[in-house]
Design a protein with these regions (language model features):
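FAD/FMN-dependent oxidoreductases across multiple families
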Residues: 30, 46-50, 57, 73-74, ...
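Helical element adjacent to the flavin cofactor pocket in flavoenzyme catalytic cores
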Residues: 36-86, 90-94
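Rossmann-like flavin
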Residues: 1-49
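Mid-domain catalytic core of redox enzymes
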Residues: 76-185
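Amphipathic alpha-helical segments that form well-ordered structural scaffolds
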Residues: 3-4, 15, 19, 57-65, ...
């Protein structure tokens, strides 16, 4: 980001830095430049959105073509040609471990755990609409990295007859701090807003530091592959791309 910070210091500090901090859940200056540029291009080339029925729709869409799907089983070990769970053993010539990096490292040797960034997101419901737009609100001097009236993007997210506001911070803060910061961001009284939920995710996103490959080799050993955003770029796109590359490698071996 050297060119941006030197040529457009005000634009970077007031707009790009707070926006990208919310994207990477960290100071964007520590993120590999090629990764940051790739993700920025994805924002420019397409319109960001959310699934109308929640992010779980991604998992449902991926699972839909699977003929024999086993759920609610804890995987205890993975080895050549077999997966052992708390319910039994399954045999397979090829295995893809598509989990968070910590779980993958616990199941397999040779998988490294990258530095992980945390985040805390809180949701409030309100009868008074903070804005009639769908824009993401950012601030360079707030304890929150961003906020959005998520129900303006998809009305199904809000309780009946109300609007749903989402806000994210990079560290745990109290409900009262969320209310205070949101009052400043949206320029309105938030004391009557209804608290809905709070999600503190310790391992929200992997750090992709300079020198790391944008697409790591997913092959581990003995027909076992690993997929996840920690194997590509820290984003949903990265996770999907990693899964695609692992599946492609297996498909080529099966032909």
């Amino acid at each position: 980001f050297g060119d941006y910070t030197t040529s457009f210091p005000t634009l970077y500090e007031r707009v790009l830095k707070p926006f990208l901090t919310g994207v990477f859940l960290s100071d964007p200056k520590i993120i590999a430049a090629d990764v940051a540029q790739e993700i920025l291009r994805s924002f420019v080339k397409s319109l960001p959105g959310i699934p109308a029925g929640g992010v779980g729709q991604f998992s449902q869409a991926l699972a839909a073509p699977v003929r024999n799907l086993k759920l609610n089983e804890r995987v205890e070990s993975v080895a050549k040609d077999k997966v052992i769970t708390n319910s039994g053993q399954y045999s397979a010539k090829f295995i893809i471990v598509a989990t968070d990096p910590t779980t993958a490292a616990q199941l397999l040797t040779g998988v490294t755990i990258p530095k992980m960034f945390e985040s805390t997101t809180t949701y409030f419901a309100t009868s008074e609409l903070p804005t009639d737009g769908k824009n993401l609100a950012i601030s360079s001097n707030s304890k929150l990295v961003n906020s959005i009236v998520i129900s303006q993007v998809s009305a199904k997210y809000a309780p009946a007859g109300q609007h749903l506001v989402s806000a994210t911070s990079l560290f745990p803060v109290t409900e009262s701090v969320f209310r205070k910061e949101l009052a400043s961001i949206w320029q309105m009284n938030t004391q009557q807003w209804q608290y809905v939920a709070n999600y503190q995710i310790k391992q929200s996103l992997p750090a992709h530091l300079p020198g790391q490959s944008k697409s790591r080799n997913s092959f581990v050993a003995d027909g076992i592959y690993v997929a996840g955003d920690h194997m590509a770029t820290p984003s949903q796109q990265g996770a999907m791309k990693s899964g695609y590359l692992a599946a492609k490698a297996i498909n080529q071996l099966m032909q």
